[in-house]
């Protein structure tokens, strides 16, 4: 269950060396493809784009304005197959929001058997005491019909027939009630201010603004028309992949190091992140209950190429559950997007929805990040559009968003599709989706904040700016003028005016990802034209 560096090849046997070699050969096409695409991008910009004064102050950035259904993109769009988990096993158990594990009598009847034909047991899942990449299991507990889970929020469940044959294996997660101390600290009005809003962040890996509009039209319509969210057309990534972008957003940190000789960027990544102040720490200090959840344990922000956290980073932390679910070997669906009978993304949505429901009368900060459906394939996330819409619809219908700032985002655009070889693809890969919805009562109390968002919706912005916005919310810095110049070293809160005459350098966007450039006409006798034709 541990995701750490392997020992050196000289210290292991020859068979493992061969296996490692096969793995390297297997991954090499992906590595070479990435290198190829980046070289194509660099060549395109050097040949066809005009440098727009990266660090100067005498120009206004012209934000590229592509139609999501541009002809260049259409040939890369397709209808993704719907998720078909099938019925690899009956739904023999479920976990209710009050923490009780139940036998599903309806499923038992449909299986053609009786309750007595099954012996079921649950095993609690715990975070490993020393590793963020492992989990621990409690002692299996046999239960009859229904039983209260003892101390964990996560369980694995197995059911056997009288013959001893395994008939069912699955897992469940729920949101326990906060401890009395946490309950009181996060209760709205416990410090005399009943109006502090909660913050809900729902992220999708590799999701550009344009592709969000293409693939998730129902969710986009709900966010923009029902939640009245502001969508930021000039939002630009600050790094190649998830980690540098989310470190800018969640910590206000620039993790890039530029080689003085080659000029190339590299990323500094610590082994552990406990000593790095993250935004949820600031919310926690100010009486918020915190939650963090990702659906792909091998590719999470803080564990891919690193070791995560020594201690649990937030009050509610679902990583042990996902590690345990990935360990299940039986009753797998033919559809890799499922755990048994259930689409994997539904576990994340259910956990987030239950958290929001139980924290309705409490201040909370929730960060849920979905990777599995959106990371690799340009089109696959479309299968979850109605599920995302329904989650937000239910939250709103139940009054759970009445005092909640909702942020929906992508970290960057898709990095693997051949769309990147086109003009529109090169641009949108740099321009992630970002939408912010302020609750109505909050807007009435602070109209200048909504005005600031609207004024900046087509400005050049980066993740450093939205880190500043999160810190404003965490610290109740909501006046027309900020009480601090900034919380990090880069960035300006989009709650307040940001100049349109802003450069990528001023926004913390590396030159490699700057979109403040224009295509230019070249004379037919230009050396660059002759080079390109060669």
Positions of predicted regions on the chain:
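Histidine-centered active-site microenvironments of extracellular/periplasmic hydrolases
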Residues: 305-313, 397-449, 479-510
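Active-site-proximal alpha/beta segments of enzymes that process anionic O-linked groups
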Residues: 152-154, 179-379, 472
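Polar, surface-exposed loop/tail segments
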Residues: 301-303, 449-457, 461-468, 472-533
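Short coil/turn segments at secondary-structure boundaries
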Residues: 35-37, 170-173, 213-217, 261-264, ...
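Substrate-binding rim/cap in mid-to-C-terminal beta-strand-loop elements of soluble/periplasmic
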Residues: 239-257, 422-477
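A long, amphipathic alpha-helix that forms part
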Residues: 12-22, 27, 149-152, 191-193, ...
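N-terminal signal-anchor transmembrane helix specifying type II single-pass membrane topology
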Residues: 1-44
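Beta-strand-enriched, solvent-exposed domains that form extended recognition/catalytic surfaces
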Residues: 40-189
């Amino acid at each position: 269950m541990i995701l750490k560096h392997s020992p050196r090849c000289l210290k292991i046997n020859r068979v493992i060396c061969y296996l490692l070699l096969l793995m390297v050969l297997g991954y090499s096409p992906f590595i070479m493809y990435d290198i190829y695409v980046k070289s194509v991008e660099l060549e395109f910009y050097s040949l066809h784009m005009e440098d727009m004064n990266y660090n100067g102050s005498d120009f206004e950035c012209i934000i590229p304005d592509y139609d999501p259904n541009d002809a260049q993109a259409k040939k890369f769009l397709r209808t993704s197959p719907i998720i078909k988990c099938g019925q690899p096993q009956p739904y023999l158990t479920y976990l209710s929001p009050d923490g009780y594990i139940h036998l599903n009598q309806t499923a038992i009847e449909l299986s053609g058997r009786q309750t007595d034909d099954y012996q079921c047991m649950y095993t609690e899942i715990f975070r490993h005491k020393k590793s963020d990449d492992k989990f621990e299991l409690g002692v299996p507990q046999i239960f009859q019909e229904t039983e209260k889970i003892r101390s964990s929020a996560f369980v694995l469940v197995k059911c056997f027939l009288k013959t001893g044959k395994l008939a069912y294996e699955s897992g469940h997660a729920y949101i326990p009630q906060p401890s009395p101390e946490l309950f009181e600290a996060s209760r709205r009005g416990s410090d005399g201010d009943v109006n502090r809003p909660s913050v809900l962040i729902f992220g999708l890996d590799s999701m550009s603004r344009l592709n969000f509009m293409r693939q998730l039209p129902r969710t986009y319509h709900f966010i923009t028309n029902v939640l009245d969210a502001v969508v930021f057309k000039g939002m630009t990534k600050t790094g190649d992949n998830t980690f540098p972008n989310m470190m800018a957003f969640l910590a206000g940190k620039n993790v890039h190091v530029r080689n003085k000789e080659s000029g190339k960027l590299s990323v500094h990544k610590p082994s552990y992140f406990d000593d790095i102040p993250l935004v949820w720490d600031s919310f926690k200090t100010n009486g918020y209950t915190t939650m963090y959840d990702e659906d792909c344990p091998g590719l999470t922000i803080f564990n891919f190429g690193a070791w995560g956290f020594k201690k649990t980073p937030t009050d509610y932390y679902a990583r042990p559950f996902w590690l345990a679910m990935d360990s299940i070997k039986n009753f797998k669906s033919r559809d890799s997007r499922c755990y048994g009978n259930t689409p994997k993304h539904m576990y994340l949505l259910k956990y987030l929805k239950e958290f929001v429901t139980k924290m309705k009368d409490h201040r909370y900060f929730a960060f849920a990040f979905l990777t599995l459906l959106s990371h690799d394939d340009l089109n696959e996330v479309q299968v979850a559009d109605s599920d995302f819409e329904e989650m937000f619809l239910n939250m709103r219908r139940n009054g759970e968003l009445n005092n909640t700032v909702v942020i929906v985002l992508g970290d960057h655009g898709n990095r693997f599709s051949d769309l990147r070889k086109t003009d529109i693809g090169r641009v949108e890969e740099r321009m992630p989706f970002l939408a912010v919805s302020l609750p109505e009562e909050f807007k009435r109390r602070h109209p200048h904040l909504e005005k600031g968002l609207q004024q900046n919706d087509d400005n050049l912005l980066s993740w450093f700016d939205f880190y500043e916005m999160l810190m404003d919310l965490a610290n109740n810095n909501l006046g027309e003028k900020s009480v601090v110049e900034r919380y990090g070293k880069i960035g300006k809160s989009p709650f307040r005016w940001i100049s349109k005459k802003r450069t990528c350098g001023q926004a913390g966007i590396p030159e490699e990802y700057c979109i403040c450039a224009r295509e230019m006409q070249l004379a037919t006798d230009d050396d660059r034209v002759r080079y390109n034709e060669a």
